[in-house]
Amino acid sequence: MSLAHGRPYMAIPGPSVMPEDVLRAMHRSAPNIYEGDLVALTDGLIPDLRRVARTEHAATFYIGNGHAAWEAALSNVVAAGDHVLVPATGRFGHGWGDMATGLGCKVEVIDFGKRTPFDLNRIEEALRADKEHRIKAVLARHVDTSSSVLNDIAGLRAAMDAAGHPALLMADCIASLGCDRFEMDAWGVDVMVAASQKGLMVPPGLGFVFFGPRAAEARARMERVSRYWDWVPRANPEYFFQYSGGTAPTHHLYGLRAALDMIHAEGIEAIWNRHDTLARAIWAACEVWGQGGPLELNIADAAHRSRAVTALRIGAPHGTDLRKWTEFQAGVTLGIGLGMAEPGDPEWHGFFRIGHMGHVNAHMVMGALGAMQAGFIALDIPHGAGALEAAAGVMARG
């Protein structure tokens, strides 16, 4: 007998749960894309996106996913033959580096594994060793969705300044924007990329690139930039179609308007605090379960765990078995252990992730944790007692 019939909970790290307000905003007929309400709506999105990113500088959007935002950002500031430095803490660090390689850049990767954050001293040393300042940009993940590590972007800026290096600091906030605290201007970030389907609570299909004055200067020095990826007309449009390089992503814009209204009604500080409390509740439950069984948080140091996603190790085949049980027996879908082992490797089945980003509250998290505990019992997976009480205690204290 399955108990999954009812409203499901997609507890994966994106696409995240879409609020009813977003769905209602998108449920409409096609608008006029040349004049009228959509033009005014889009004009209003830009300052509100800046508020979420904590920047006074340029905000642009592209029809595409986070990978599109990666390429758009790179295409405006680096050319074939340019050097970039990639500190990697999981699958997506390597992914952005691979994209730079595909554009003809010379990529140097510093691999910190999948369980620890950046070692800022090693990055500073690498930049000091670049006496000729060949490195044009440092491509850094704020949060790597695969490993759930949270990196110190403000500390990275300080390390770059200490090295006296002029490289651009480019931050990937695809998993973290609207979930983990991020301060683009205060932290000295030159370029930030994000996407619609995680903390911004909109379906996949919008990529965002924010850039400051140093990045604008780098763009001005470029000999050639793809006409489509060029952020100059998007940031300073003379005509409405230039915002999106052609036909507007109409219904995504309606959804984004509703999502930004929700974000600003709650307040970004309150959103960060909500994500922090819910994440700590999940960690508390997992730590208790781990005291009596194989479950282990992928990131040992809580200071370097994302508040948007939690990666877990449990040993094969328990990860896959638990995911299947919670989905088909309880209606809770957990995330696969993306990038933790190669597909086909038996160890791949020993990892999973919990997404807790965007439109998520206390009862949703407690429900997911309850489903997981039921799965441990049903599958006879050893686990410590008292996990739900530990999570509830965190929520009660706030």
Regions found by a protein language model. Give the residues of each.
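Conserved PLP-anchoring active-site segment centered on the Schiff-base-forming lysine
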Residues: 78-94
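Active-site phosphate-binding strand-loop segment of PLP-dependent enzymes
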Residues: 118-177, 191, 199
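Conserved N-terminal alpha-helix of the aminotransferase class I/II PLP-enzyme fold
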Residues: 25-72, 95-101
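N-terminal "arm"/small-domain region of PLP-dependent enzymes with the aminotransferase-like
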Residues: 1-36
